[in-house]
Regions:
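Class I SAM-dependent methyltransferase SAM/SAH-binding core
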Residues: 87, 91-136
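Acceptor-substrate binding/catalytic loop of class I
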Residues: 208-223
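Conserved class I S-adenosyl-L-methionine
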Residues: 2-73, 75-84, 177-202
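A short glycine-rich, Lys/Arg-flanked "PGG" loop and its adjoining helix->strand segment in the class I
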Residues: 160-175
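A C-terminal cap/extension of S-adenosyl-L-methionine-dependent methyltransferases
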Residues: 138-140, 193-195, 223-230, 236-280
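A short acidic, Gly/Pro-enriched loop at the edge of an enzyme's catalytic core
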Residues: 136-147
């Protein structure tokens, strides 16, 4: 990439009004090369095919609670569990967070580190780091003001131990924000049943050679998430359900229905929810 192009990318990344605009700069290509570029293309394949206005809006709103918490507390210690290629971690660092992203996929951590190197070369996201690690690898004394998980919790096992570990990593008054698929949604459950059979826990050998339990799309409800973390000392502050239709342009015309209030009667229609809890 030429110097003028890099300068333009730096301005657009730093000046992005939301995370969707931030990701769009990366989707245009040219900032990564080699294995990192290939991993990025595969990881964001659906967004590269279609990143429409509706999809962009929901992608931007998905991180709204975590984003607001970081902006309200510059320098907040942030942990992203299951960071993937690091888009949310990098964005939260741009908002003023001191961010650590962890993942158990070596290729994704390498891709996130490559993106971080680009950001830091452009003068951004200095307070950010990515580690190949599980939450169980984090020291007992580690404390975070915000823990963020996006479509990760349903993979983490053993579930009860995960909940206790996550709660222990939260500083007093720290927040937990989890974005998850809604187990009440019948269409989602049918799709998952066809794709993976019954929800189950399997043993996987990680990229580091260690065996660990893995939840095969063990999605849960917001009510169950609230109960699990309440038992571990994390009190629910809010739950927000959103989005009814998949990420395909054909559904854009129905977006008006997705703004309907999330009353109990229509909760099964929503695909996702965000849970926000605070450690007392």
């Amino acid at each position: 990439m030429t110097v003028p192009a890099l300068t333009d990318a730096a301005v657009r990344l730093a000046g992005a009004p939301d995370i969707a605009a931030f990701l769009s700069v990366w989707l245009e290509g040219g900032l990564l090369d080699g294995a990192a570029a290939e991993t990025f293309r595969h990881y964001y394949g659906s967004f590269r095919r279609s990143f429409t206005g509706r999809t962009r809006r929901y992608y931007a709103s998905q991180i709204a609670e975590a984003e607001a918490l970081v902006r309200a507390r510059p320098g907040a210690r942030v942990l992203e569990v299951g960071c993937g290629l690091g888009t949310e971690s990098l964005w939260l660092a741009l908002q003023g967070g001191d961010v650590t992203g962890i993942d158990l996929r070596a290729d994704r951590v390498a891709g996130a580190q490559a993106r971080l190197a680009v950001m830091q070369r452009l003068g951004h996201a200095q307070q950010c780091r990515f580690q190949f690690a599980s939450v169980f690898d984090l020291p007992a004394g580690a404390q975070y003001d915000l823990i963020w998980m996006e479509q990760t919790f349903h993979h983490l096992e053993p579930r009860e131990q995960i909940v206790r570990k996550i709660a222990s990593l939260l500083a007093p008054g720290g927040h937990l924000v989890i974005s998850e698929a809604n187990a009440w949604n019948p269409a989602l459950q049918l799709e998952l049943l066809i794709r993976r059979g019954l929800p189950r826990v399997i043993q996987l050998t990680g990229d580091d050679g260690r065996a660990h339990p893995y939840g095969v799309e063990r999605v849960t409800t917001a009510a169950n998430l609230r109960r699990l973390f309440a038992d571990a000392g994390v009190v629910c502050q809010s739950i927000r359900h959103f989005r009814m239709f998949p990420n395909r342009p054909v559904f854009d015309r129905f977006s008006v229905f997705e703004t309907a209030p999330g009353t109990a009667a229509i909760l099964p229609l929503f695909l996702y929810y965000n849970y926000v809890g605070v450690r007392r």
